[in-house]
């Protein structure tokens, strides 16, 4: 889990646009962010395997 202070800090509007860093909306993780879903790769995988993200399923070929 991310530090609570970092999560709160990222929710505030930053002074400059380049200072903004995307964070997972579920756990607050700053790395591995998937922009389309607003989640990090770990949370995305958990929710996708549970079937909670509509239109997403595990690929197989």
UniProtKB/Swiss-Prot annotation:
The keyword Zinc applies. InterPro entries: Ribosomal_uS14 (IPR001209), Ribosomal_uS14_bact (IPR023053), Ribosomal_uS14_CS (IPR018271), Ribosomal_uS14_sf (IPR043140). One of its GO terms (molecular function) is structural constituent of ribosome. GO terms for biological process: translation. Binds 1 zinc ion per subunit. Zn(2+) binds at residues 24, 27, 40, 43. One of its GO terms (cellular component) is cytoplasm. The keyword Oxidoreductase does not apply. It holds the Pfam family Ribosomal_S14. Part of the 30S ribosomal subunit. Contacts proteins S3 and S10. Binds 16S rRNA, required for the assembly of 30S particles and may also be responsible for determining the conformation of the 16S rRNA at the A site. Belongs to the universal ribosomal protein uS14 family. Zinc-binding uS14 subfamily. NCBIfam families: PRK08061.1 (NF005974). This is Small ribosomal subunit protein uS14. The gene is rpsZ.
């Amino acid at each position: 889990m991310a530090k609570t202070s970092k999560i709160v800090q990222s929710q505030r509007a930053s002074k400059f646009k380049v200072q903004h860093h995307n964070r997972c909306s579920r756990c607050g993780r700053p790395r591995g962010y998937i922009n389309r879903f607003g989640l990090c790769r770990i949370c995305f995988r958990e929710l996708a395997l549970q079937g909670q993200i509509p239109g997403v399923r595990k690929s197989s070929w």
